Design a protein with these regions (language model features):
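Non-catalytic cap/lid and distal C-terminal segments of serine-dependent acyl enzymes
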Residues: 35, 51-91, 96-291
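A short, amphipathic beta-strand motif
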Residues: 28-34
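Positively charged n-region of N-terminal signal peptides that target proteins for export
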Residues: 1-4
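Boundary at the C-terminal end of the N-terminal hydrophobic targeting segment
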Residues: 23-25
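Bacterial N-terminal signal peptides
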Residues: 9-20
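Beta-strand signatures of extracellular beta-sandwich domains
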Residues: 44-48
Length: 291
């Protein structure tokens, strides 16, 4: 009996020692000052870690196995100087937890993607990111807060606290200008405004046929392209390709100098468009900025 009691006591002491050992947990705290934004914000805080310093981490985020590390957490009413904590409990990609990220030197950046609350006509109230002219690209959305990238020696097995300050705000996007061949239209939709409970707009980019000004009363066939959110008429370039353009490799298409190919093809299309034997018609690309 004495032996059994001794074993139980020893086991209890061992467990006590185990659980009393220091538990290291790296944390990242994200905040912004009143000088950057004085109001509270609903949205999503995004933390990015990259070993590539050729560009900001927010421009390196992509799907796939070669993705940079990213974490995200939703926030409601985040105010100035309030710290949002990202620790081992926050889900990430491609590595799921902060604790499993390999130690090393990383370029670290955080961004706060703004959400809006919509009181819809169907009775539902939802909080969603509204497009602000960028085509639902959170890393370029005007009004989003982000931090200046900083290099940090990252050690997941430490109890350090990394503080990241959102010290920048993305500027509004200038709408594209009309040209001889491309016009832009923007109207408020009564139906969408009523449904979403706030002003909603539809846009269109119009490619005019060659000779349109000389024949203002002519009727033309119409081709409508309904994609996602085109920023302007694409693949149409009146200027010749830039001879000094620095080549960029396309990972998507596995093509060298793909940016140069795009300019060449866009200018070739323009030359065909104004050619004497090319059909004359209107092209419209629809722009619908929904949440």
């Amino acid at each position: 009996m004495k032996r059994s009691t001794t074993l139980v006591t020893a086991g209890f002491l061992a467990l006590t020692a185990l659980f009393s050992m220091p538990c290291f947990s790296l944390e990242v705290e994200v905040s912004f000052s009143a000088e950057v934004e004085s109001e509270t914000i609903d949205g999503r805080v995004i933390l990015m870690l990259s070993t590539n310093d050729a560009d900001e981490p927010r421009f390196q985020v992509r799907p796939g196995v070669n993705a940079i590390q990213i974490f995200g957490v939703n926030v409601e009413g985040m105010g100035p100087e309030e710290e949002v904590r990202i620790d081992g409990s926050v889900f990430g990609y491609p590595i799921q937890t902060l604790e499993d990220v390999p130690a090393g030197t990383y370029q670290v950046q955080a961004l706060l993607h703004r959400y809006e609350t919509f009181h819809r006509a169907d009775g539902h109230t939802v909080t969603l990111p509204m497009d602000r002219g960028e085509g639902q690209q959170w890393n370029r959305a005007p009004g989003n807060l982000y931090s200046t990238p900083q290099k940090i020696d990252f050690a997941p097995d430490s109890d350090a606290i990394i503080r990241v300050k959102l010290d920048q705000i993305i500027s509004p996007i200038e709408p594209p200008s009309d040209t001889e061949y491309v016009k832009h239209v923007r109207i408020q939709s009564e139906l969408l405004t009523e449904f979403w409970g706030r002003p909603m707009f539809l846009g269109a980019h119009v490619l005019l046929p060659h000779g349109y000004k000389e024949h203002p009363d002519a009727h033309y066939p119409l081709m409508i392209f309904h994609g996602h959110f085109p920023s302007d008429i694409g693949d149409f370039r009146t200027e010749p390709p830039d001879p000094d353009l620095e080549c960029e490799y396309s990972e998507r298409f596995h093509v060298e100098c793909y940016n140069r190919v795009q300019q060449e093809e866009a200018h070739a299309f323009y030359q065909k468009w104004i050619g004497p034997d090319f059909p004359r018609f209107l092209v419209i690309e629809i722009q619908h900025a929904n949440p």
